[in-house]
Amino acid sequence: MTSDDIARSVPSRSVETCSALTPEQTEAVLELLAEAARIDGQQAVSEQGRIQLRHSGGGGREGVSHLLLTVGGELVGYAQLEDTDPVEAPAAELVVHPSHRGHGHGRALGTALLAASGKRLRVWAHGGHSAARHLAQVLGLTLFRELRQMRMPLTGLDLPDPVFPAGVTVRTFVPGQDDAAWLAVNAAAFAHHPEQGSLTQRDLDDRMAEPWFDPAGFFLAEREGELVGFHWTKVHAEERLGEVYVLGVRPGVQGGGLGKALTTVGLRYLAAQGLPTAMLYVDADNKAAVSVYERLGFTTYETDLMYRTET
């Protein structure tokens, strides 16, 4: 959710809701997102949202809607609404072209999202900008989640050798061979986190098709041939950032130091790629995880905020 909170009448403005987009519409939205990211210094739509956007042709994705705001036929705003969680309200992200902010387009998109979601809505504000906070207030949304992006320097990194629990060995992910086992452990490790824990084979395939995917940075921990944990890293080549993309430990194996050991393996790998900085995302209310990362040397870089309608 970005700035743009002034409600003014724009006669030529319209909002179209689509379950699937044409290649031309997809390209126009991607260009809008790129320009917004260039001006704002960050993405307005998450990686998951951008993947769903790029795969929005054909019949689209079940539970995913795309809202296109045009003025005089020109695309000036975009929102994505995902209604796939059986419990939580539909989740949305939105953006207005930097050259068209200040004309009520953000509020128009927000109002359309409320209508499309049956007034049960969660909205991300990446970076937590003040204009986004104000728009959330105007729409009657309240803050309920804070997601921290934390970073640490990798230059000169001197981490102790990882110490794994007895019987645990580490190897890298083999696409096509380890898919089912990884999906099962990921679902178990993130049962409390529907966004991550609900990943499907299609979601995994989409990520493996991304240019950044490299199984050499996807580490699996096994005991007696069974997967018990993993650390999937990601390299942001353009920004020269290494990410602790997903780190998970199977329930029942937690508490033995496996998570810390896997973190060390991944950070060492990222440092060996010559990347100067590592990053990760963690919920602010996960005090234990935040404390672990702070002890490793991570500090908060920025915070994404999620707002929702009152339940």
Residue ranges and their predicted role:
Residues 1-11, 83-91, 97-168, 307:
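Acyl-donor-binding surface of acyltransferase catalytic domains
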Residues 2-54, 162-197:
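Short amphipathic alpha-helix that is part of the acyltransferase structural core
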Residues 21, 26, 31-117, 122, ...:
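Conserved donor-binding loop and adjoining core beta-sheet/short helix segment
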Residues 65-68, 217-220, 264:
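Hydrophobic beta-strand residues of extracellular immunoglobulin-like
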Residues 73-77, 144, 215, 226-229, ...:
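Glycine-rich acetyl-CoA-binding "A-motif" of GNAT/NAT acetyltransferases
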Residues 102-116, 246-251, 255-272, 290-295:
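Conserved acetyl-CoA-binding loop-helix of GNAT-fold acetyltransferases
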Residues 149-169, 173, 178, 281-287, ...:
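C-terminal "cap" of GNAT-fold acetyltransferases
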Residues 190-236, 251:
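Phosphate-binding active sites in nucleotide-utilizing proteins
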